[in-house]
Amino acid sequence: LYLLVGTFALGAVGLAQAAGFNLSPQCPPSFERTDVGVCRLRSMYQTYTRIEGHGGVQMALPPARDGFTPQQIDLGRHLFFDPLLSGDRKSSCAHCHHPDHGLADGRATGAGFGAEGFGPERRGGVALPRRTPTLWNVAYATRLFWDGRATTLEEQASGPLFSPQEMGNSAERLTQDLNANTSYRQLFAQAFARSEDKAITLNEVTGALAAFESTLISLNSRYDRYAHGDRKAMSAREVQGMNVFRGFVARCTQCHTPPLFTNHELAVVGAPPPAKGQPIDEGAGAITHDPLLRGAFKVPTLRNITKTGPRYFNAGQLGSLDEVVAFYNAARGHALPKGEKQALHWHVHMMKPKLSDDDAKAIVAFLGALEDETMSPQPPAAVPSGLPVVPVRAAPH
């Protein structure tokens, strides 16, 4: 069952502007409004001080990107769901980072500019070479995109907006469209505490998107409740998988380090080509020209990994989490084409750990305990452009 929201039509001379918008003065759940009016995340993890080690529970979190006002966050939410941000006015950020699909799209690789629809059913348009990354916990990210080319949420936001292959817009047209919209001029003035007479800037646009994305936090899974002391939160099978996951043989936590289940580093794991007969994706090596980073990709978070399938790896080469575990259980470089040379990661877990079938399946069971979508964003009822808002599943009551 889907909830359709924001069904406004195009006018004869342009977009019909929707009226009556106001930004929420409240911080999102799990955020607290401070005395200076900004929202700060509050989590049990902030009470922990241990930062060393890879497999332990009750580990401290790294610094997060927060400190935005409620109005800036809510403005970012409206922008995130507004197709006005794309060059053809067909796709919003949410069409590819959809709440129903783990803030990704459920496709093997993304469908870019000109595509229709959302999620796994998105069709047509530019065929993108990589999977759409999830946005869960990007507030903690120090590298963004599969190749790690962005270091801030603002930089990440501007990448797809102005890529001809993705959203196909330009900075000039985007700011022109926003400034021509009375409602957006009012909302930006609210969010940034300034006069409506001042023109909307690109920095304000990417800043608002960063504010919203900083609230996409997933830290309340059954694993988290177990880590905080509730030993009944996970099943015996999941606890077995956790112990294999963090144990000496598998050492998954060397890269997928709790509590974020990523270390945000670039890793060369010998990923197979995107498809049989195709050349490998050089990853970070293509932009750094460093031979040691040929085939390197950012270590993805495993939070909500069960929600972002069914395809995995940088180009959806693997079709299940069982296949992913089997990949790491095999010999180093086994999936690389003959003659392909890569500086493979040296960790012990890349040396064919020889996990039993039972232990491998237990790891997959444990990954299900990392599900938490309690802070999944809800779309606005309408957006200032008047364009249709992408449908989302009706929230269960």
Model-derived features: positions:
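Core hydrophobic alpha-helical transmembrane segments of single-pass membrane proteins
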Residues: 7-12
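Periplasmic c-type cytochrome electron-transfer domains
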Residues: 2, 14-397
